[in-house]
Amino acid sequence: PNGFKIYWAEKGVMIATGGFSANEEMRTMYMGPWAANLKIRGSLRNTGENIMMTRPLGAKLVNMTEFYAGPIVPETHANPARVSNSAYGMIVGKDGKRCVDESLGQAMRSKLLPQVTPDNRTFIICDIKTNDEDNILTKLLDRFKRLNSPVYEANTIEELADKAGINKANLVNSVKEFNKVISEGKGPSLVPPHNRKKAHPVATAPFYAIPMSGGIAATFGGPKINKHAQVVDVDDKPIPGLYAAGN
């Protein structure tokens, strides 16, 4: 309220302010337009201003495209990973079409979701048999209920599509194709492929649609440092008095 304070550093400045996961402009600049749709899983304060302040000093910025990703429901911060990382279910966009290989690890899968959908809004479509894996569906439903995070349930795929706002015709066709190909043991032939070694059909009511988006937890880029934690310039020479630590 009383204006800026100016501090004069006698021996140097240490930057330890985290990354830029919450800065949409920087994500777009360094990762691409799709990254604007990533949902925040980590701190809203990781906005990267101090990283950008090193640019006029000639700092070499490295690893600016790298980050850790994971699934999230952005409105409630519920985490659907327990089911999305299981051997059950398929992942579709709001158009009702499968959009990613479900066998991918959660970080890679979450990075792809905003690239293969227009709005980074998807659903895990699964059935009650998902509980065969350590009762994971019931555990997720209990947690989502505590967080007031919606999960849609129905006795038919058609009804499920209506409840979740998914394209009905496409979802019905996607589930039929998925079940047929999985039953034949030809999951890798799907587009996109399904490479789970023990794949399961979505065939036993009740059926569930669990919202999921790709989220960003932390970025890994920033000013490059040497073994003395000195920030270096584009020629890898130390910038006097400037140090950095962290991601």
Residue ranges and their predicted role:
Residues 2-5, 12, 19-21, 45, ...:
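Short, glycine-/Ser/Thr-/acidic-enriched flexible segments
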Residues 170-246:
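A glycine-rich dinucleotide-binding beta-alpha-beta segment and adjacent secondary-structure elements
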Residues 41-44, 79-82, 103, 114, ...:
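Short Gly/Pro-enriched turn/cap motifs at secondary-structure boundaries
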Residues 8-11, 86-87, 118-121, 237-240:
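Short coil/turn connectors at secondary-structure junctions
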Residues 3-72, 78:
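Glycine-rich loop(s) and the adjacent beta-strand/alpha-helix scaffold that form part
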Residues 47, 51-53, 59-166:
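An anion/pyrophosphate-binding glycine-rich loop and adjacent beta-alpha core
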Residues 10, 16-17, 62-64, 93-94, ...:
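Generic beta-strand/beta-sheet core signal
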